[in-house]
């Protein structure tokens, strides 16, 4: 939220983070509220844990090594592209680049020739179908862009799919899918402006 709107209260963010950290169960997971009334509270345990770790890492909090390891283990076991993508982004955010690259390599191998990825179950908001494809592909594109040696072909496939998933009204399906797609495409636009190596430009005037 802070990256989108600088006016967000830091104390509110800290309270939210502390609430999540206090929900740690000591085994690498987070305790869920059984009284949750919305789709965020209805996601499966592995999806919820992966999303919380991803969110905390995006916010810059690093004291979650145990939770990250648990999410990574479960993602490898399940082979679910959605949780693997959340895990890969968290790994990169926390400086675990080698482990992040390994997770990305697994995702690339799982893509096949279809040009997009989809989760095996549902997303944190219990999205399925086209929205799940868009959310998963967006998260994977974000991870691909963070890789130490970005796979240009995989990146291009993901971008092509996301651009094609946009509706005539400018959305990409569900609210969550639209947010992630816009974030991923914005990061791609920044990435595409980079040069491969440092250099100088000479301007010759005749």
Model regions and ranges:
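Large, well-folded core regions of big proteins
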Residues: 1-206
């Amino acid at each position: 939220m802070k990256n989108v709107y600088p006016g967000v209260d830091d104390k509110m963010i800290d309270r939210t983070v502390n609430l999540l950290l206090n929900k740690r169960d000591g085994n690498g997971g987070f305790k869920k509220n059984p009284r949750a009334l919305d789709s965020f509270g209805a996601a499966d345990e592995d999806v919820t844990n992966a999303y919380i770790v991803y969110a905390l890492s995006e916010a810059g909090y690093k004291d979650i090594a145990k939770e990250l390891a648990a999410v990574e283990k479960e993602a490898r076991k399940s082979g679910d592209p959605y949780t693997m993508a959340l895990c890969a982004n968290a790994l990169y955010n926390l400086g675990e680049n080698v482990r992040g690259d390994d997770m990305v390599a697994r995702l690339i191998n799982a893509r096949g020739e279809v040009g997009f990825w989809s989760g095996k179950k549902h997303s944190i908001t219990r999205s399925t179908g086209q929205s799940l494809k868009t959310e998963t592909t967006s998260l994977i594109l974000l991870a691909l862009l963070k890789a130490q040696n970005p796979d240009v072909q995989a990146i291009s496939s993901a971008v092509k799919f996301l651009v094609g998933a946009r509706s005539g009204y400018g959305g990409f399906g569900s609210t969550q899918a639209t947010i992630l797609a816009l974030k991923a495409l914005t990061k791609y636009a920044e990435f595409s402006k980079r040069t491969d190596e440092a250099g100088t430009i000479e301007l010759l005037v005749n």
